[in-house]
Amino acid sequence: MLISNEWLKDYVNVDQSVQALAERITRTGIEVDDIIDYTKDIKKLVVGHVLSKTPHPNADKLNICQVDLGEEEPVQIVCGAPNVDEGQHVIVAKVGGRLPGGVKIKRAKLRGERSEGMICSLQEIGISSHVTPKNYESGIYVFPEAVKPGTDALEALYLNDQVMEFDLTPNRADALSMIGTAYEVAALYQTKMNKPQLTSNESQESAKDELTIEVKNEDKVPYYSARVVHDVTIGPSPVWMQFRLIKAGIRPINNVVDISNYVLLEYGQPLHMFDQEQIGSQSIEVRQAKKDETMRTLDGEERRLLDTDIVITNGKDPIALGGVMGGDFSEVTEQTRHVVVEGAIFDPVSIRHTSRRLNLRSESSSRFEKGIATEFVDEAVDRACYLLETYASATVLKDRISYGDLGSFVTPIKITADKVNRTIGFNLTDEEIIDIFEQLGFKTENKNGDIIVNVPSRRKDISIKEDLIEEVARIYGYDDIPSTLPVFKDVTSGELTDRQFKTRTVKETLEGAGLDQAITYSLVSKNHATDFALQNRSTIELLMPMSEAHSTLRQSLLPHLIDAVSYNVARKNTNVKLYEIGRVFFGNGEGELPDEVEYLSGILTGDFVNNKWQGKKEPVDFYLTKGIVERVAEKLNLQFDFRAGQIDGLHPGRTAIVSLNGKDIGFIGELHPTLAANNDLKRTYVFELNYDAMMEVSVGYINYEPIPRFPGVTRDIALEVNHEVTSSELLSIIHENGEDILNDTLVFDVYEGEHLEKGKKSIAIRLSYLDTENTLTDERVNAVHDKILEALKKHGAIIR
C-alpha cells in the first residue's frame, strides 16, 4: 500500500517529518518498506506558458517555442514533443536544473537554434509509464487549466510529497486504505481524525423508482446496495485527484472511473459504476453463475464461468463478475449520462477462488479476499456520489436501494486492566487503557471493573482479549515499556517433560540402530492420502492446493518416506534406513476440525550390514525390522504383541499387526512386490505405530535388576505345530505356566521342510529358569518344565 503524506494530511495532521512518522509506524508493527520522495534529484522545475510555436527550420520533428516562465522575458526552448502547442501550460526544467537520473539542464543549440530549458513529460520527472495518463504517454504533460507561469511545477502537480510504502501482513487489511491508516496515525500521536465530506445535494427523484435489487445467494452476498446518479459529465478528473492516484500506483482514466478508484483507496471499499442505460433493465439480480455461462469482462476477454462464481445480472445476463471485474457492455464511456454506484459485501473465499482461477487479481479483489469493513460500505457509496456531484456535475437521486443486512459494525470484547498489566509486565490504569482504545476509534466503557471494547469491523485482526492487549502495547510503544526482571515465587531447574524424555529415548534408540530421521511434507496427493491407513476415516483436502501432489492432509507417514527412499536409491544410495515422527490427520466431517495424531514410522531397504571386513553382508528383513520395533518398546518398558495381518500395500504373508494392551496401534511388514517395483525398490520393510498411544501408557520407572546371586538353568524345547500357529501364542502359554521361576524365553530357530508333514513347522525355544532367592533344584525345575510341556500339548503342540 502506498500512502501519500500530502493525502494523509486531509484526515490527520501531525507535526512530524515523514521519516519520523515512518519510523514510529514501523515500531508499532506496520513495516514501512520504503519512502518515495518525488522531489528527490529535481531542481528548478516550474510551470511555463507556451506563447508561440514555430517549426524548426532545420528539423522536421522539432519546434521552436517561446515560453513564459514568469520572468521579465520569455525563453526559447526547442521541443520535439508531437503534442506541444501554443497556449499550453507545461512543465519546464530551467537552465541549471536537474531531473531524475542525474540529467542536468544546460543552454544548448539544437540544429543551430538555441534552447534554454526543457519542456518535460511526466516520465522525465520520475513518473512511471504504467501510471501516466494515456493521452500523455508519448508526449509532454499539459495542465488542463491555466497555472501562473513560474509556479513550482511540483507544487502544481501535488508532487511536493513523500510516499510511504507499507509492507503489510495479511491480517492488517485495515491499513489498505487512507482512512484506516489515518486511524492508526491519530492513535499514535493522540490527535483527532477528520472524516471526509459525504453529504450530497440530493434531487427529489427517488432511486427506488428507477431500480430494484434482488440477491439470490445471500450466503455469498450478505449485503448489496446501490445509488443512482444522473446527468454525469464525463471528463478528466481534477489534477489533485489524478496525481493522488498516480502516487498510489493507479493510472487516471476519467472523472467517473477515477472517483471509483479514489474512494477504493480512501475507504478500502471497492465500488463499481455501471452505465445505467446499458444495464438493459430496471432491475439488478445477484446470483451464482450457471455452469459454462459466459460473459465479456472489461479487459475484453470472454470468460467461461463456474457455478462457484458470483455474478451481477440485469435479471437475465451477467453485467459484472461480483467483486472481481465489471462487464464490458455496461462500462462507463464518454457517452455515459446516468450511473449506478454499487457497494457490496462479497464472500472472501468465493472472490479468491474466482480471481485466482481467472487470473484477475485487482485492487478490488485483493480487498474483498481479506474482508472489508461493513461500517464503510454505505459511507463509501455516499462519498462517491458527493465526488460525482462535485467533479462530474452530476445530480444524485435521493434514497439508497439495498438488499440484505450489514450486521453489527462492532464486536464487543471484555477485558480487565489486571489481565492487560499481567501480560505486558507493567501497570496501566483503567483510564490509560481506555484512552488508548478510544484513540484507535474503539468505543469503550467501564462496567464494574470490566472494560468493554467495541471493536469496529475494519479491524478484523482483533477477535480475542490477547489481540486487545497487543493493541495496548503497540500504541503505548514497545520501546516505552519499561524493562523489568521477572519475579518468581518458586525457582526450579528446568527439565524434560515425560513425553520429551521418551521421545529423546526413541530417537536415540532408532539412530543407534542406524536409522536417520526424516521430515516429510504433511500434504500428499489425493490418490495416496489413505495409503496404509489403519482407520477408515474421511480425508481433508485443501481448497487451494499448491499442486495436485500436495492437495490432501496425510493419514500415514509412509507415502513420502517411500518417495524419499526411492529418490535415494535412484541416486545410487541403495542402503537407506529412515524414521519419522510426525502428525497424521483424520477428518470428522464437514465443518469440524480434524483429529491430529502423532505417528512413528520407519522404512529400511538394502543391506543392514554391508562392510565386507565385518563379515557376511546382512540385508534388512522382516525380523530385523521387528527387532528394531521391539527394542523401542523395551526402552519404553512397553510390551508389544504381534499377530499376522493384512494391510493394503504390504506383502500378504509378511505383515504383522502390532498391539499394545489389547489395542491395535500399528503394523510391520514388507512392501508389496508390485508397489516396491513401481518405486524401483528391492525388498523394503516398513513399520508404522501410533506414537500418541505409546506415549499415553504410563509405565513408571524402569527399575534396575541386580546381577543374580544364584545360578540359573536353561532348557531347550522343539515344538511341532500347525503352520498358522505363531511363536507369540506359544510364548504366551509358556509364560502362563512358568510360575515365578521362568525368567526368560527366546525363539532361536524356526524350521519348515523335509521330515515334517505338510502344513507343519518346528519352533525351537530356549527357556531360562532362575530363582533370585534360592538355588534351583532339578525337582523344582522339572516340575515347572513338565507343567509347561503339558500345557503346550493341550494346545496341539508335539514335543520333538
From Swiss-Prot:
<dbReference type="Pfam" id="PF17759">
    <property type="entry name" value="tRNA_synthFbeta"/>
</dbReference>
<dbReference type="InterPro" id="IPR005147">
    <property type="entry name" value="tRNA_synthase_B5-dom"/>
</dbReference>
<dbReference type="Pfam" id="PF01588">
    <property type="entry name" value="tRNA_bind"/>
</dbReference>
<dbReference type="GO" id="GO:0004826">
    <property type="term" value="F:phenylalanine-tRNA ligase activity"/>
</dbReference>
<dbReference type="InterPro" id="IPR033714">
    <property type="entry name" value="tRNA_bind_bactPheRS"/>
</dbReference>
<dbReference type="InterPro" id="IPR005121">
    <property type="entry name" value="Fdx_antiC-bd"/>
</dbReference>
<feature type="binding site">
    <location>
        <position position="471"/>
    </location>
    <ligand>
        <name>Mg(2+)</name>
    </ligand>
</feature>
<keyword id="KW-0963">Cytoplasm</keyword>
<dbReference type="GO" id="GO:0006432">
    <property type="term" value="P:phenylalanyl-tRNA aminoacylation"/>
</dbReference>
<feature type="binding site">
    <location>
        <position position="470"/>
    </location>
    <ligand>
        <name>Mg(2+)</name>
    </ligand>
</feature>
<dbReference type="InterPro" id="IPR002547">
    <property type="entry name" value="tRNA-bd_dom"/>
</dbReference>
<keyword id="KW-0436">Ligase</keyword>
<keyword id="KW-0547">Nucleotide-binding</keyword>
<dbReference type="InterPro" id="IPR045864">
    <property type="entry name" value="aa-tRNA-synth_II/BPL/LPL"/>
</dbReference>
<keyword id="KW-0030">Aminoacyl-tRNA synthetase</keyword>
<keyword id="KW-0460">Magnesium</keyword>
<dbReference type="GO" id="GO:0016740">
    <property type="term" value="F:transferase activity"/>
</dbReference>
<dbReference type="InterPro" id="IPR009061">
    <property type="entry name" value="DNA-bd_dom_put_sf"/>
</dbReference>
<feature type="domain" description="B5">
    <location>
        <begin position="408"/>
        <end position="483"/>
    </location>
</feature>
<dbReference type="Pfam" id="PF03147">
    <property type="entry name" value="FDX-ACB"/>
</dbReference>
<feature type="binding site">
    <location>
        <position position="467"/>
    </location>
    <ligand>
        <name>Mg(2+)</name>
    </ligand>
</feature>
<protein>
    <recommendedName>
        <fullName>Phenylalanine--tRNA ligase beta subunit</fullName>
        <ecNumber>6.1.1.20</ecNumber>
    </recommendedName>
</protein>
<dbReference type="InterPro" id="IPR041616">
    <property type="entry name" value="PheRS_beta_core"/>
</dbReference>
<dbReference type="InterPro" id="IPR012340">
    <property type="entry name" value="NA-bd_OB-fold"/>
</dbReference>
<dbReference type="Pfam" id="PF03483">
    <property type="entry name" value="B3_4"/>
</dbReference>
<dbReference type="GO" id="GO:0000287">
    <property type="term" value="F:magnesium ion binding"/>
</dbReference>
<dbReference type="GO" id="GO:0000049">
    <property type="term" value="F:tRNA binding"/>
</dbReference>
<dbReference type="InterPro" id="IPR036690">
    <property type="entry name" value="Fdx_antiC-bd_sf"/>
</dbReference>
<comment type="subunit">
    <text>Tetramer of two alpha and two beta subunits.</text>
</comment>
<dbReference type="GO" id="GO:0009328">
    <property type="term" value="C:phenylalanine-tRNA ligase complex"/>
</dbReference>
<dbReference type="GO" id="GO:0005524">
    <property type="term" value="F:ATP binding"/>
</dbReference>
<keyword id="KW-0694">RNA-binding</keyword>
<keyword id="KW-0820">tRNA-binding</keyword>
<feature type="domain" description="tRNA-binding">
    <location>
        <begin position="39"/>
        <end position="154"/>
    </location>
</feature>
<feature type="domain" description="FDX-ACB">
    <location>
        <begin position="708"/>
        <end position="800"/>
    </location>
</feature>
<feature type="binding site">
    <location>
        <position position="461"/>
    </location>
    <ligand>
        <name>Mg(2+)</name>
    </ligand>
</feature>
<dbReference type="InterPro" id="IPR004532">
    <property type="entry name" value="Phe-tRNA-ligase_IIc_bsu_bact"/>
</dbReference>
<dbReference type="GO" id="GO:0140096">
    <property type="term" value="F:catalytic activity, acting on a protein"/>
</dbReference>
<keyword id="KW-0479">Metal-binding</keyword>
<dbReference type="InterPro" id="IPR045060">
    <property type="entry name" value="Phe-tRNA-ligase_IIc_bsu"/>
</dbReference>
<dbReference type="Pfam" id="PF03484">
    <property type="entry name" value="B5"/>
</dbReference>
<dbReference type="InterPro" id="IPR020825">
    <property type="entry name" value="Phe-tRNA_synthase-like_B3/B4"/>
</dbReference>
